[in-house]
């Protein structure tokens, strides 16, 4: 490794990843006491940030010794030392520029103090707060984002599905007539295909929607399949149904802007496969309110979160409206809700549960951290399929972005696995006005 550095950690880094102390190699880490004070405010509650705060404090308690405040406590083999900076550190440079005594400015003071104390050693603030990084740079302090789980090139996940032109028309004819598809060796693809990648094959006179099946090493035709009254309106939606319906694909990511049909397609596919699962679970994170704010709303827990679950019920109503109100399909949906065979609820309510034989759909997954996504996936028991939907550019969490959110992180880590499939939906199917707003505003 290069020259050893000092890193000063902001509270939001810990709330994002409670294991962050293990990700700074042999460099030393400094923890301002004000960070511990801020963590104390987050320990109560059942959201992921509350869990992260508690876990970090527990980990800190295990490594605490008398040297933590003086010479630093060793973090383990291949890692540096951890220091807790107790008390208030005065920094004339910080005080002159930012006279208000708030936690952010106290953290900046620690960075400045370390810089003055060790002029030959880089001292760097690590924070996910963009404004705090701007303040640090304005007075000449080094700073950076926490990049351990960042995905560098997200553009590749937002492309339309590949269209391969100049394909031998006889191959396309054979794909149409073959149930098993054709061996991939018969095609001359320039790039290696990812497992379950969907694409269009075109010749000068015909075309076919296709998918690479990694289990049979074949290129198979994608059929236009209808699920519980919902019919795909374009090639991308056909691709989505293809991977949503395949029992061999246990993990699916559907991305795309608003109006592309991500959640509706996932729910329709789940309903179409009901005989294969004991339960359908549709959940989304509550982003707009913290736990404390949620408590001030009237009603019980379900009534408090109901407004944030409404978009999921709206998708269910779209499916119901495909049938007559007195039809067996609508009655079946209502019976499923009454018997908890179809459950729509806030993501926080399912934390800690083991999900077996469940078709689990997590909506707005771009608002989850990588650790949250991992935690949810590890809850999957036998016979469970997990689908994550979201727009990786529409982030509502203050310390996540298009490169660090859990959805894009999952796609990046899983895209070469046979059990995983990703489909990006580009074409909006709501209304002309909705499409115009998504593209221009």
Model-derived features: where do they sit?
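Conserved P-loop
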Residues: 264-332, 397-418
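Conserved coupling/interface region of RecA-like P-loop/ASCE motor cores
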Residues: 41-74, 310-312, 408-441
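Conserved glycine(s) of the Walker
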Residues: 259-261
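N-terminal pre-P-loop "Q-motif" helix
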Residues: 229-248
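Pre-Walker A (Motif I) flank of P-loop NTPase domains
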Residues: 247-253, 357
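Active-site-proximal, substrate-binding regions of enzyme catalytic domains
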Residues: 3-124, 130-227
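Conserved RecA-like ASCE ATPase "motif II neighborhood" in helicase/translocase motors
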Residues: 16-18, 338-361, 365-375
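Hydrophobic anchor at the beta1->P-loop junction of P-loop NTPases
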Residues: 254-256, 266
């Amino acid at each position: 490794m290069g020259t050893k550095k000092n890193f000063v950690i902001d509270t939001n880094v810990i709330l994002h990843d409670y294991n962050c102390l293990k990700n700074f190699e042999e460099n030393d880490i400094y923890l301002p006491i004000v960070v511990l004070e801020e963590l104390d405010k987050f320990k109560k509650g059942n959201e992921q940030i509350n869990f992260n705060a508690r876990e970090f404090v527990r980990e800190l308690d295990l490594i605490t010794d008398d040297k933590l405040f003086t010479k630093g406590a060793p973090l383990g083999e291949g890692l540096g030392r951890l220091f807790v900076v107790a008390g208030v550190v005065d920094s004339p440079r910080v005080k002159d520029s930012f006279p208000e005594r708030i936690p952010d400015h106290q953290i900046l003071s620690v960075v400045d103090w370390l810089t003055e104390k060790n002029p030959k050693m880089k001292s760097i603030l690590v924070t996910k707060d963009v404004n705090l990084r701007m303040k640090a740079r304005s007075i000449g302090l080094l700073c950076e984002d926490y990049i351990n789980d960042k995905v560098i090139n997200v553009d590749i996940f937002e492309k339309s599905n590949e269209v391969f032109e100049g394909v031998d028309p006889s191959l396309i004819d054979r794909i149409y007539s073959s149930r098993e598809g054709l061996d991939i060796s018969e095609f001359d693809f320039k790039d290696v295909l990812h497992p379950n990648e969907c694409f269009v094959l075109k010749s000068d006179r015909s075309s076919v929607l296709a998918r690479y099946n990694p289990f049979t090493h074949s290129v198979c035709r994608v059929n236009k399949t209808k699920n519980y009254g919902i019919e795909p309106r374009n090639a991308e939606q056909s691709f989505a149904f293809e991977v949503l319906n395949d029992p061999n694909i246990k993990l699916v990511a559907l991305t795309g802007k608003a109006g592309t049909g991500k959640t509706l397609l996932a729910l329709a596919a789940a309903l179409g496969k009901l005989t294969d699962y004991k339960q359908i679970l549709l959940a989304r994170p509550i982003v707009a309110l913290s736990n404390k704010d949620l408590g001030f709303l009237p009603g019980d827990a379900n009534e408090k979160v109901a407004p944030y679950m409404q978009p999921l019920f709206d998708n269910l109503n779209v499916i119901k409206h495909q049938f007559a109100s007195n039809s067996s399909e609508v009655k079946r949906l209502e019976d499923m809700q009454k018997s908890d065979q179809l459950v729509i609820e806030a993501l926080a309510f399912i934390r800690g549960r083991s999900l077996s034989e469940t078709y689990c759909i997590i909506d707005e997954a771009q608002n989850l951290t990588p650790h949250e996504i991992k935690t949810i996936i590890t809850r999957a028991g036998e016979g469970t399929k997990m689908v994550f939907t979201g727009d990786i550019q529409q982030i509502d969490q203050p310390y996540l972005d298009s490169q660090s959110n859990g959805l894009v992180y999952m796609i990046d880590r899983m895209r070469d696995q046979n059990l995983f499939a990703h489909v990006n939906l580009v074409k909006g199917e709501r209304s002309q006005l909705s499409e115009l707003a998504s593209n221009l505003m």
